[in-house]
């Protein structure tokens, strides 16, 4: 069995991030990557090199995001530089719903490893409760967290959304 090689294991976009959550990358302080020992006293550091995020190097961008998130530190921090970026909308399901609000998403995305990079795959469905000559679906066994409405007679897994776990 060949080994799976992950070239980029870092995940900035995922299913557990709050939809209003943001993270500042490329600040003047290195990001903690992983512990080098089992005691956790020494750690490896990294810096974000992806394409995601909005540059917040200028005063007016920092002011705008400080007002948007009610976070004074975005405005007054001396840890932000010209290359600093703000990554927002990190929850992949809410990100996909904003891109395609007319589709219903599966609330259980899964990771795939493609060419050394991690990608989230989200199933998207088209639904109707007016499909001719079709009986209503039995929805009694559908999980409440599924994101599907309770009444439909047609469902099709018509779209797969793919989100890069590092870049978004």
Residue ranges and their predicted role:
Residues 1-167:
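Soluble extracytoplasmic regions of secretory-pathway and membrane proteins
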């Amino acid at each position: 069995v060949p080994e799976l090689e992950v070239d980029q294991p870092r995940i900035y976009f995922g299913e557990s991030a709050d939809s209003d959550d943001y993270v500042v990358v490329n600040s003047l302080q290195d990001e903690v990557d992983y512990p080098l020992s089992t005691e956790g006293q020494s750690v490896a550091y990294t810096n974000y090199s992806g394409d995601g995020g909005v540059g917040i190097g200028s005063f007016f961008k920092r002011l705008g995001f400080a007002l948007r998130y009610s976070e004074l530190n975005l405005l007054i921090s001396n840890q932000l530089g010209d290359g600093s970026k703000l990554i927002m909308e990190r929850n992949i399901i809410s990100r996909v719903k904003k891109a395609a609000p007319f589709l219903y998403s599966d609330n259980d995305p899964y990771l795939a490893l493609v060419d050394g990079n991690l990608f989230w795959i989200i199933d998207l469905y088209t639904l109707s409760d007016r499909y001719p000559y079709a009986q209503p679906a039995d929805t009694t066994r559908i999980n409440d967290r599924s994101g599907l409405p309770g009444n439909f007679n047609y469902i099709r897994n018509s779209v797969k959304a793919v989100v890069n776990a590092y870049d978004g």
